[in-house]
């Protein structure tokens, strides 16, 4: 899965959050590849790394439903095979591992299920108290990609309709106003329709924090 961020990330490991975010806030684009621990073939991991697009700047690791400790196993093996920074993108708190470089600390703002608005975050605190992970508060907005996604099933929430641009913009702004440092617009794994350029432009015009766009992106050109 391809993920586009409207701001770049350096290939070197950042140790201070202010440095990491400063790099995010520059003007170029970057490309992240999401690897789901529950779907990856570990025996072919080296081949997967070798065939990553040349434009890849970092990796996301995570999924909606992942066996406990599998994320840590995958991150550890990836770190041994690539210098690319690894961000964990957890579907729940059990996927958090200190082996990664950074954590997208997600709040599902497009839905109203308290489990994914705050309860998973509270459950993660004991793991995060003494972590070396860069923790990045992230507003996560599920956008309708034309088919039901695993995020929708697991979270028991509905995605935001693509035609409701103002509602999407307002939700993104609410995320920024509440202290989030990234906006994540997600059409979902296997989406038949990616987040429209109109939505991306409208959100980018209104927010002052970086935007990540994912789901339905099948090529570097997209």
Label the model's feature ranges.
Residues 5, 87-88:
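A structural signal for short, well-ordered beta-strand segments and their strand-loop junctions
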Residues 11-35, 127-137, 144:
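N-terminal amphipathic alpha-helix/helix-capping segment at the start of soluble metabolic enzymes
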């Amino acid at each position: 899965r391809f993920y586009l961020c409207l701001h770049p990330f350096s290939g070197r490991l950042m140790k201070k959050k202010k440095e990491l975010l400063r790099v995010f806030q520059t003007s170029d684009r970057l490309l992240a590849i999401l690897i789901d621990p529950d779907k990856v073939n570990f025996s072919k991991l080296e081949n997967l790394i070798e065939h990553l697009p040349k434009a890849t700047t970092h990796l996301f690791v995570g999924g909606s439903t992942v066996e406990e400790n599998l994320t840590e196993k995958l991150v550890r093996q990836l770190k041994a095979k690539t210098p690319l920074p690894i961000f964990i993108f957890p579907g729940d708190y059990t996927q958090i591992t200190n082996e990664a470089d950074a954590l997208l600390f997600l709040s599902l703002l497009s839905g109203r299920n308290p489990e994914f608005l705050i309860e998973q975050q509270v459950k993660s605190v004991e793991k995060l108290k003494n972590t070396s992970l860069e923790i990045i508060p992230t507003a996560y907005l599920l956008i309708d990609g034309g088919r039901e996604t695993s995020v929708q099933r697991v979270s028991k929430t509905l995605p935001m309709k693509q035609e409701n641009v103002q509602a999407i913009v307002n939700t993104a702004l609410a995320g920024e106003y509440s202290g989030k440092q990234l906006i994540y617009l997600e059409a979902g794994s296997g989406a038949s329709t990616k987040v429209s350029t109109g939505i991306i432009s409208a959100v980018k015009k209104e927010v002052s924090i970086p935007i990540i766009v994912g789901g339905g992106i099948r090529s570097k050109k997209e």
